[in-house]
């Protein structure tokens, strides 16, 4: 029994020496004592290849490469102890979830923390750490007693409570495992216990290579190997000079030196002979003097400079994608020009979550075979999502999001349907569920679902059309596709008495859906498209899910469990599932994490993402215990994993390992921005490299090739997939700025695409975008007639929409596009309710021959309650009755109608104007409808403007009859003559024109009428600020002022006094007008003369004719208006359709100049002056 160390700096040949010794021994004695070659898990494959890679050794039974866990498996198979069921990470998380749920009431700190994402991953890691460091539940309990007895501060009590929770959960976990199960950490403890009984290990020659430190558990294994084996050889990366001086925690080799001393101490304790250490001083790894210099002087202070040609290259990239593309281009160059194999190249990185997806995509585009040494989670696979969402449907009472997450996995679809058709139908079905607010009991009820198009509150027609009946049948058919398998599982889960029966319900759910056949179809499709990685995913995921169910049954099969806990435990297990890595092929670029990689025999290393906070790593205090808490436990004798401070001290060694892997070339790169465009800083490590290598190449990488030389641009010509975007970039430059002499070879590349049989069709769409202009071509007369008909019939809002943006008008009224209907209460719905409520009250007053002025406060409250109760069942598929939240909203709306009724009562008492009618239709046909506003357009097309007027008021005096328009609005609004001029606010003046033009035939007395004005009434329930001692009357007066109607009124003092009979001088509280003492109007009054009203009405006619002419002539320009801070695009539903983009030459706003009312009026006069 002896111990031997082989030490040396990185690249000194430690592994090579050991491998050569083993190979020579196998060559001399193929059938001797066992040779164990122990390496970290991630080194096993490459070490196995290296061991049998020589000409003399093509295979071996005597020598085997193991990790500690694989050695444990081997020994336990020999001596026994492997019969207990293994539970993987997913099983551990599921068991912990169950333990926490059952212990929840007794936990001090983790009761609420258990609901946070990642809690069970952290808890599992903490327990694994306890085991690796030989900390038992009783050790943790003793620690809690000690902490509890001496806790005085809040921080000490928190730690004591945390340790108490941990010992409870750890003890429960161990009790659940004992005699039945083994987790990954238990194998190593069993290995320690069983090594003395192993004949396979007894007398073995043991090599331990590639480790820098050992956990206490691993150190015990080393102890037993020294006792049982003939000789143990351990390699450590240490400079011999370090051993000759006192150890310092700032030394580069501090960690490995401590490991060296610990192992020697173990050997002394066991009286193991310690052979003379073999120091290796040469640097056989490095074929480059620069890399040899970097290794030899890495830790030197000040930095030792290398003045020769550096085989180190630094790349600074504009962004992460440009960085990865730069790496891909250089890899292709090395393979094409310097005869590298892909296996000679490795890419090292730390923040893989930011890079892996981009690297998979780009390396595939560049045809670079690659292997990412990182397991991917299964959580996004359709099968995992199907199970998780189906369980959420049942436990969460059939919520919309869970249902359609399950639907979108497409595993609920019948096996024999065409997926494309089913997707379209399910999209329609989802629209229905959104529009009708389908959830909860409606899914499980046997009552068929009804389909009716919602039109308006006035639509009381109960007849169903053929198209509605057809849609209703389709919806009920699709409902059954979705709900039937889930309801079957729901019933089984409710009947289930044990976890085993619940797992069986999940299994039967999958079997009845033909999931194995569907996954097989997905696998075949992936193979046919050449995506072999995803093809194997579909095989793995089924096996892992079945294994998870088996584990669940094995661990908890006979226990009873609530449905919610079963769902939580199952979800925890599913989240832990990971895809196993496919072993790398013989010729692939290896992409690995800096902290976990153990590379060898690579000629070129690319270290990417070298940004501040990443390399070296910024301190991160994460996990169950903080650094301070770990220090407290350490002081009390419980050794755990290194703290953040210790990890930071080890970071220099990690970086040293990182830059000493390659034999010939080292590339270091960093992006200056992430995928979202956020600025990133280069690491201080790059500055260090620049100081060591003054001649280092520092290249800036960008995806914009315009500023590069011709030779540099040629490197961007890679695969056809990648190069196409650069061709486009260059041709766009040529198009904008002309030929600059640097583009000639890009024309050759362009010619390849347009002449290649394979790429001609593939590239045509991309290349055609070179001449793309986001401009809507004018419709032909024939198309325009097909869309709009021979007679245009539209509302004033439609005409205003055309003037806001002709393309939006085309999308809405030509193509009939609309947003999908969602079961929610929007502003238009509330506006509709307000209008209907006030009309119902007014109609009741008319039937009773009363006016608003006759109402008492109590009657206002009663009527507002009555009408809201009448309307609520009719609005938006009974949305106000659908939930407690909407019921509360209904009460708030009733209060607004109540307040509005009180104000209308006050207005009626102060006004000579009385309502003639509400919701007055014109051009709508039927009884009581006024005629439309009609126009004959120059091209012969007839146009009718139709609509519905909120309220028409009338007043009479000795000067005649006056009519005014009141428009109810749920937000504050006034009449802006600038917007009238631009055709954006035509509604009120149109209404006034309609009623005054038809007054003689419409009103009972048959008199002509003059315009009195147009006013907006803001329906709301305002909050007012008053002094603390304000009386009720003063408060009501302030509220009344908040309802002052804005708009434009006739500049006649008598008419204004008819609107507010309390007005003598000063400003009116009812309308936007005021009188001076001399009887003239104040400057702030919004008034117009009768002649000006006539001009405005003529201008409205003029504007409608122009709009009609443009519509019928096919004008659909993408030309939204912009006026100040208002723009047509702000609330437009069609932005995704028109793709308006200000950066494009053709896409610019029509900027409308703001004007004073007097200026606008003058321009309006000029427009209609000739009419």
UniProtKB/Swiss-Prot annotation:
Manner of cofactor binding, per the entry note: Binds 1 [4Fe-4S] cluster.
- The residues listed in the UniProt record as binding ATP, with positions renumbered to this chain, are 8-15
Q: What is its EC number?
A: 3.1.-.-
Is Nucleotide-binding found in the keyword set?
yes
Q: Where is the UvrD-like helicase ATP-binding domain?
A: 1-343
SUPFAM superfamilies xrefs: P-loop containing nucleoside triphosphate hydrolases (SSF52540)
Q: What Pfam families does this protein map onto?
A: ADDB_N, PDDEXK_1, UvrD_C
* Entry's Gene Ontology molecular function annotations: 4 iron, 4 sulfur cluster binding; 5'-3' exonuclease activity; ATP binding; double-stranded DNA binding; helicase activity; metal ion binding
Asked if the record carries the keyword 4Fe-4S, the reply is yes
Q: So where does [4Fe-4S] cluster get bound? A: 805, 1129, 1132, 1138
The entry's keywords: 4Fe-4S, ATP-binding, DNA damage, DNA repair, DNA-binding, Exonuclease, Helicase, Hydrolase, Iron, Iron-sulfur, Metal-binding, Nuclease, Nucleotide-binding
Q: Which residues form the UvrD-like helicase C-terminal domain?
A: 281-587
Q: What class of enzyme is it?
A: hydrolase
Name the cofactor(s) required for activity, per the record.
Answer: Mg(2+); [4Fe-4S] cluster
State the Gene Ontology BP annotations: double-strand break repair via homologous recombination
Q: Which Gene3D superfamilies match?
A: 3.90.320.10, 6.10.140.1030, P-loop containing nucleotide triphosphate hydrolases
InterPro entries associated with the record:
ADDB_N, DNA_helicase_suAddB, DNA_helicase_UvrD-like_C, P-loop_NTPase, PDDEXK-like_dom_sf, PDDEXK_AddAB-type
User: What family does the Swiss-Prot or TrEMBL record give for this protein?
Assistant: Belongs to the helicase family. AddB/RexB type 1 subfamily.
Misc remark: Despite having conserved helicase domains, this subunit does not have helicase activity.
Assembly information from the UniProt record: Heterodimer of AddA and AddB.
Q: Sum up the protein's function in the record's words.
A: The heterodimer acts as both an ATP-dependent DNA helicase and an ATP-dependent, dual-direction single-stranded exonuclease. Recognizes the chi site generating a DNA molecule suitable for the initiation of homologous recombination. The AddB subunit has 5' -> 3' nuclease activity but not helicase activity.
PANTHER family xref list: RECBCD ENZYME SUBUNIT RECC
What is the protein's name according to its record?
ATP-dependent helicase/deoxyribonuclease subunit B
């Amino acid at each position: 029994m002896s111990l031997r160390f082989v030490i040396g700096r990185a690249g000194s040949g430690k592994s090579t020496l050991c491998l050569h010794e083993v190979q020579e021994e196998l060559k001399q004695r193929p059938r001797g004592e066992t040779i164990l070659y122990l390496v970290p898990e991630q080194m096993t494959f490459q070490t196995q290849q290296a061991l049998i890679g020589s000409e003399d050794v093509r295979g071996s039974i005597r020598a085997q490469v193991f990790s500690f866990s694989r050695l444990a498996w081997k020994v336990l198979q020999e001596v026994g102890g492997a019969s207990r069921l293994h539970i993987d990470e997913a099983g551990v998380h599921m068991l912990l979830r169950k333990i926490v749920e059952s212990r929840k009431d007794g936990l001090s700190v983790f009761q609420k923390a258990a609901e946070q994402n990642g809690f069970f991953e952290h808890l599992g890691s903490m327990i694994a750490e306890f085991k690796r460091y030989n900390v038992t539940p009783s050790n943790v309990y003793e620690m809690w007693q000690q902490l509890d007895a001496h806790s005085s501060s809040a921080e000490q009590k928190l730690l004591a409570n945390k340790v108490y929770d941990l010992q409870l959960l750890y003890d429960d976990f161990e009790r659940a495992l004992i005699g039945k199960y083994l987790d990954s950490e238990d194998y190593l403890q069993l290995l320690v216990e069983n090594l003395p009984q192993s004949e396979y290990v007894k007398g073995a020659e043991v090599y331990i290579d590639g480790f820098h430190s050992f956990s206490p558990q691993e150190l015990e294994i080393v102890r037993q190997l020294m006792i049982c084996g003939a000789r143990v050889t351990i390699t450590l990366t240490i400079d011999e000079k370090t051993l000759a001086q006192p150890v310092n925690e700032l030394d580069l080799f501090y960690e490995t030196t401590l490991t060296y001393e610990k192992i020697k101490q173990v050997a002394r304790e066991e009286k193991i002979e310690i052979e003379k250490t073999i120091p290796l001083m040469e640097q056989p790894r490095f074929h480059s003097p620069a890399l040899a210099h970097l290794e030899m002087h890495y830790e030197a202070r000040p930095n030792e400079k290398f003045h020769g040609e550096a085989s180190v290259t630094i790349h600074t990239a504009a962004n992460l994608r440009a960085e990865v593309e730069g790496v891909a281009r250089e890899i292709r160059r090395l393979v094409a020009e310097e005869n590298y194999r892909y296996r000679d190249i490795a890419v090292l990185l730390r923040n893989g979550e930011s890079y892996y997806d981009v690297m998979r995509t780009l390396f595939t585009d560049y045809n670079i075979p690659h292997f990412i040494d990182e397991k991917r989670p299964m959580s996004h696979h359709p099968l995992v999502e199907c199970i998780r969402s189906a369980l959420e449907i049942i436990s969460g009472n059939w919520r919309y999001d869970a249902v359609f997450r399950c639907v979108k996995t497409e595993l609920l679809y019948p096996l024999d349907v065409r997926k494309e058709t089913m997707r379209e139908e399910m999209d329609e079905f989802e629209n229905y569920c959104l529009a009708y607010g389908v959830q909860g009991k409606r899914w499980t009820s046997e009552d068929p679902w009804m389909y009716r198009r919602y039109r308006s509150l006035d639509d009381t027609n109960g007849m169903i059309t053929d198209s509605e009946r057809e849609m209703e049948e389709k919806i009920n058919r699709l409902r059954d596709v979705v709900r039937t398998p889930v309801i079957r599982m729901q019933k089984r889960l409710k009947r289930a008495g044990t976890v085993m029966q619940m797992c069986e319900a999940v299994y039967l759910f999958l079997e009845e859906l033909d999931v194995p056949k569907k996954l097989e179809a997905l696998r075949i499709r992936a193979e046919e498209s050449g995506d072999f990685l995803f093809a194997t995913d579909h095989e793995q995921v089924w096996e892992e899910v079945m294994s998870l169910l088996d584990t669940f049954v094995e661990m908890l099969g006979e226990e009873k469990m609530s449905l919610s806990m079963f769902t939580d435990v199952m979800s925890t297990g599913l989240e832990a599932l990971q895809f196993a890595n496919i072993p790398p092929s013989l010729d692939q670029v290896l992409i690995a994490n800096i902290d976990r990689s153990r590379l060898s025999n690579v000629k070129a290393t690319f270290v990417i993402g070298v940004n501040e906070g990443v390399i070296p790593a910024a301190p991160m205090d994460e996990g169950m215990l903080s650094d301070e808490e770990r220090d407290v436990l350490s002081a009390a004798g419980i050794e755990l994993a290194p703290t953040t401070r210790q990890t930071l001290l080890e970071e220099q060694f990690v970086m040293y390992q990182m830059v000493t892997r390659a034999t010939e070339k080292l590339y270091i790169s960093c992006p200056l921005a992430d995928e979202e465009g956020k600025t990133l800083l280069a690491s201080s490590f790059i500055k260090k490299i620049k100081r060591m290598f003054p001649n280092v190449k520092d290249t800036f990488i960008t995806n914009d090739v315009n500023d590069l030389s011709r030779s540099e641009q040629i490197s961007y010509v890679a695969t056809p997939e990648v190069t196409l975007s650069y061709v486009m970039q260059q041709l766009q430059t040529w198009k904008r700025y002309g030929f600059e002499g640097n583009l000639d070879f890009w024309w050759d590349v362009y010619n390849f695409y347009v002449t290649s049989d394979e790429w001609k069709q593939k590239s045509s769409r991309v290349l055609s975008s070179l001449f793309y202009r986001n401009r809507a071509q004018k419709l032909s007369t024939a198309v325009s007639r097909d869309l709009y008909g021979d007679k245009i019939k539209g509302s004033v809002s439609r005409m205003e929409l055309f003037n806001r943006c002709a393309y939006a008008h085309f999308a809405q009224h030509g193509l009939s596009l609309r947003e999908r209907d969602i079961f929610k209460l929007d502003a238009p719905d509330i506006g509709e309710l307000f209008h209907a409520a006030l009309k119902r009250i007014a109609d009741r007053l008319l039937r009773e021959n009363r006016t608003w002025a006759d109402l008492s406060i109590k009657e206002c409250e009663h009527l507002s309650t009555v009408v809201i109760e009448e309307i609520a069942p009719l609005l938006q598929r009974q949305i106000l009755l659908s939930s407690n939240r909407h019921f509360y909203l209904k009460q708030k709306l009733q209060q607004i109608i109540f307040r509005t009724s009180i104000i209308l009562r006050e207005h009626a008492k102060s006004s000579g104007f009385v309502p003639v009618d509400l919701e007055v239709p014109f051009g709508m046909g039927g009884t009581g409808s006024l005629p439309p506003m009609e126009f004959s357009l120059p091209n012969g097309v007839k146009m009718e403007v139709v609509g519905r007027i909120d309220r028409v008021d009338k007043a009479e005096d000795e000067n005649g009859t006056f009519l005014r328009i009141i428009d109810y609005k749920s937000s504050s609004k006034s009449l802006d003559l600038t917007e009238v001029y631009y055709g954006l606010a035509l509604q009120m003046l149109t209404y006034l024109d309609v009623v005054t033009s038809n007054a003689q035939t419409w009103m009972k007395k048959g008199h002509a009428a003059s315009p009195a004005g147009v006013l907006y009434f803001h329906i709301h329930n305002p909050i007012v600020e008053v002094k603390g001692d304000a009386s009720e009357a003063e408060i009501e007066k302030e509220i009344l002022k908040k309802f002052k109607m804005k708009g434009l009124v006739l500049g006649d003092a008598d008419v204004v006094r008819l609107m507010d009979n309390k007005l003598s001088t000063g400003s009116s509280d009812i309308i936007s007008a005021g009188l001076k003492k001399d009887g003239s109007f104040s400057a702030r009054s919004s008034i117009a003369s009768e002649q000006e009203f006539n001009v405005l009405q003529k201008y409205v006619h003029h504007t409608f004719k122009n709009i009609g002419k443009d519509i019928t002539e096919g004008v659909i320009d993408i030309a939204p208006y912009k006026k100040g801070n208002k723009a047509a695009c702000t609330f437009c539903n069609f932005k995704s359709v028109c793709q308006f983009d200000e950066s494009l030459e053709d896409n610019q706003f029509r900027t409308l100049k703001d004007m004073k009312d007097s200026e606008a009026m003058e321009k309006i006069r000029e427009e209609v002056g000739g009419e």
